């Protein structure tokens, strides 16, 4: 196991998001079951931490951008900086929605349509951000998620305000369409993994990659779909489960997503103005980590060890030739020794 290879593609931004969502879902399940009696402002603490890190990271990155104009000419620096600003704008709208949700739950004095208003603005902004991201070859997962769920946001707000009286199974029809697409993606990876396993022309590394992708998508999509079905059945009154068993599949999906962040790219380098990979940044701050980052473990059979211990004979060395005038030492390669040309005397005419 090579620790350097494990952490070189680590994505700290996504790891932070998934970790905060996992902790928030745990606290929310405990609060809904009455195990803890915290205020919802405290239950949303992981969400506040997530948004705080986004705001601080963007502020520091903007300060570094403003104080160092020479950085703007480095490759795709402008594209990454604009991507960071787009992400900050969307996160601020999400923060407004989350604050309104907490206020609505604690006081209950305004309509849910007003609470969901920031999400109604997020969706068109996310569509524009997705178009911009496709043009500049940027991956915008959060923006895509917000843009495709605009109809779902409207249905949920109308159902909570009792403007429509549909069962939750019907309200979540846009969600079922999205999950059907994700199930097709899982099926695609499974089929390709089987084909790569049966093919003899594919190297082992490609087989492992496709199998890992198939297992990862299965571990993400199947528990997530299970969680959504259990939650909808509970809201419709078809089961009497407590919230903790319902949230367990969601926790499994989030843990899998956290594990996948170790094999993805490092994300935007302008967060906190570090301008480099996160692991390289940590190694520069904490030099003692380099000793552990350079450790790798390699398991061999005994036959391989005996083969490695056998010394390899070195080729014979030929003594160097010296030229006195130029004072240059020339070392001849083994088996390619060439005699020097004979001395040529040129007589000058009288």
Curated annotation (Swiss-Prot):
<feature type="transmembrane region" description="Helical">
    <location>
        <begin position="111"/>
        <end position="131"/>
    </location>
</feature>
<keyword id="KW-0472">Membrane</keyword>
<comment type="subunit">
    <text>Interacts with MAP1B.</text>
</comment>
<keyword id="KW-1133">Transmembrane helix</keyword>
<feature type="region of interest" description="Mediates interaction with MAP1B">
    <location>
        <begin position="298"/>
        <end position="350"/>
    </location>
</feature>
<keyword id="KW-0966">Cell projection</keyword>
<protein>
    <recommendedName>
        <fullName>Transmembrane protein 185A</fullName>
    </recommendedName>
</protein>
<dbReference type="InterPro" id="IPR019396">
    <property type="entry name" value="TM_Fragile-X-F-assoc"/>
</dbReference>
<keyword id="KW-0812">Transmembrane</keyword>
<feature type="transmembrane region" description="Helical">
    <location>
        <begin position="41"/>
        <end position="61"/>
    </location>
</feature>
<feature type="transmembrane region" description="Helical">
    <location>
        <begin position="211"/>
        <end position="231"/>
    </location>
</feature>
<feature type="transmembrane region" description="Helical">
    <location>
        <begin position="240"/>
        <end position="260"/>
    </location>
</feature>
<feature type="transmembrane region" description="Helical">
    <location>
        <begin position="81"/>
        <end position="101"/>
    </location>
</feature>
<feature type="transmembrane region" description="Helical">
    <location>
        <begin position="177"/>
        <end position="197"/>
    </location>
</feature>
<feature type="transmembrane region" description="Helical">
    <location>
        <begin position="16"/>
        <end position="36"/>
    </location>
</feature>
<dbReference type="GO" id="GO:0016020">
    <property type="term" value="C:membrane"/>
</dbReference>
<dbReference type="Pfam" id="PF10269">
    <property type="entry name" value="Tmemb_185A"/>
</dbReference>
<comment type="similarity">
    <text>Belongs to the TMEM185 family.</text>
</comment>
<dbReference type="GO" id="GO:0030425">
    <property type="term" value="C:dendrite"/>
</dbReference>
């Amino acid at each position: 196991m090579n620790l350097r290879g494990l952490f070189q593609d680590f994505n700290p931004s996504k790891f932070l998001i998934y970790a905060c969502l996992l902790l928030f879902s745990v606290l929310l399940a405990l609060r809904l079951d009455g195990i803890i009696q915290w205020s919802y402002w405290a239950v949303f603490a992981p969400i506040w931490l997530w948004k705080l890190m986004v705001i601080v990271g963007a502020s520091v990155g903007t300060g570094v951008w403003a104080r160092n104009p020479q950085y703007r000419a480095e490759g795709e620096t402008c594209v990454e900086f604009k991507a960071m600003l787009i992400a900050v704008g969307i996160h601020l709208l999400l923060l407004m929605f989350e604050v309104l949700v907490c206020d609505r739950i604690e006081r209950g004095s305004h309509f849910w349509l007003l609470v969901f208003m920031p999400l109604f603005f997020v969706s068109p902004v996310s569509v524009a951000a997705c178009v911009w991201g496709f043009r500049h070859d940027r991956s915008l997962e959060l923006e895509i998620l917000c843009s495709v769920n605009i109809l779902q946001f409207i249905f949920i707000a109308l159902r909570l305000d009792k403007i429509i009286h549909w069962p939750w199974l019907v309200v979540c029809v846009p969600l079922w369409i999205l999950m059907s697409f994700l199930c097709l993606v899982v099926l695609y990876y499974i089929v390709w993994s089987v084909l790569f396993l049966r093919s003899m022309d594919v190297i082992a590394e490609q087989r492992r990659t496709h199998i890992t992708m198939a297992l990862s998508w299965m571990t993400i999509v199947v528990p997530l779909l299970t969680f959504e079905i259990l939650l909808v059945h509970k809201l419709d009154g078809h089961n009497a489960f407590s919230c903790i068993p319902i949230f367990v599949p969601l926790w499994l999906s989030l843990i899998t997503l956290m594990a996948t962040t170790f094999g993805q790219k490092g994300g935007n380098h302008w967060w906190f103005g570090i301008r480099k990979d996160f692991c390289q940044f940590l190694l520069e701050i904490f030099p003692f980590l380099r000793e552990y980052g350079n450790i790798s473990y390699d398991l061999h059979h005994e036959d391989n060890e005996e083969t490695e211990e056998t010394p390899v004979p070195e080729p014979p060395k030929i003594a160097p030739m010296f030229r006195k005038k130029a004072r240059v030492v020339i070392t001849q390669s083994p088996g390619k020794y060439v005699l020097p040309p004979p001395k040529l005397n040129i007589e000058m005419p009288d």
